[in-house]
Amino acid sequence: NSKVTRQEHRILIDGVIELGWGKNKETTYIGALESALSVTDRAFSYESLMAVSGLAFRVRWWRGEDEEGQQFCPSSPVGEFETEVERVSNAIGWVQSVDVRFDRPEGHYGFEEDLPQIQASIDAGMPVMCYGKIMDVSVVYGYIEDSCDLLLMDYHGKPGEGTLVSASQIGPMMIFFGAKADHYAADTWFERALFTAIENFENKGFKSKTPGMYYLGEAAI
């Protein structure tokens, strides 16, 4: 469905949905996913993706093991965790290949090495998702020829304009779209959304790499 165009030295995918705060699409993973999929044959609404991922029905809060120490983490509300990504991939019938590099020094994530793959995806009309300069999920929808510069649709750019970012400045996460399968039928989509709502409430949570726990559902309240 997507159309790739050239504007001087810019190679762009047309029609990617704009992102921004104050649009009732504050979960950046789902907002970026809706935007990226909008130019494919697997376009789904923000609301549908929030439902089937379980994020619409999830309360999560991180607390550190040391009661005198940190008791909140900014990652508490984010959507791009393994469980939610897997749920969405199953629903849309499209594998999301997630590359996370938090173990590398800040600012040295190495995604410039992936520039040929990013550009090839854009050339094929398929956006890529990543963290930009700020760790909110963005959509790579274009690039500048003969450079390392990428065009991002993100939550922090000016309306009507993309954000120009070097491939060396993105990360530490990137998501490529991989193999396709059948997506859920409408009744299965609804059924899975209800199931995840119950699962999120009954699940007590899970331990984090940093000493602490992500509490879910009733345990998080």
Predicted ranges, named:
Residues 2-105, 123, 129-135, 143-221:
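Cys-His-centered catalytic/binding microenvironment captured across papain-like cysteine peptidases
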Residues 101-120:
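Mixed-charge, Lys/Arg-rich low-complexity intrinsically disordered regions
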